[in-house]
Amino acid sequence: METEIWKYIDELAKRIKRIIIVFIASLLAFLAIPSPSPFGIKGSSILFYDTLIFWIIRKMEEAYLPPDSKLIVISVTAPLFAILQMAFYLSLIIAIPVAFREIYAFVSPALYRREKAIIKKYLLPFSLLYLTGMIYTIIIVLPLTFRALIFLYYHLNIELFINLNDFINIVILMVILGGLLFALPTLVLPLIEAGILGTRTLSKNRIFIYLIIAFIASLISPDPTFLSVIPLLIPIYALYEATIYFGRIIEKKHSKVS
């Protein structure tokens, strides 16, 4: 018995080690990978080597902020922390799929064949919906969010200065949130298929769940008017209703089989 426990602990340690290695390798790679024009900013000197992280931050600034706004830092070390922060988030995005794969490989021997089939069935839809949510947030939600915020500042006649670290946090967290919220159906439908959750519960608590989703989105969004969050909530609520619809189909199939 004790030997079996240590065997599982050793297996778990190996899989955690793989996740950490992927994360650290991604972190170092993002800090070292050159931008599309690595010496195109201030000359050809190695002192002005331009990394992919710098390039991404500049593109974010160009996409979401007006030309007369300024990104500021409040300490000497803030730019360094901003670079590490961006590299950390990007590395996390790379490491998360690896973590899911390793977790599944660890627990799969204890799962029944039907449970394995359910998990495998929703892996691709989860990835596609998560990616769609991130792209939708980048293209639609974030521009509207910053436009609403800037509109408010201009009408109050306030000059716009945005903290670099806050800017990165807002963008990355909203992108991750958008991806996760879009992927919710692929997390709920397996629970319905496994008989753990029912569509009646989802229908009964619909308003409460809508309010929770809206509250979480408003916490991350910097827009105090809440208007820019609406384009994110509309497709998510539509996906929630679609989840209930397909969940009922699954329940009917199960009732016929039984």
Feature-to-residue mapping (PLM):
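Membrane topogenic/interface segments and analogous intrinsically disordered interaction regions
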Residues: 1-258
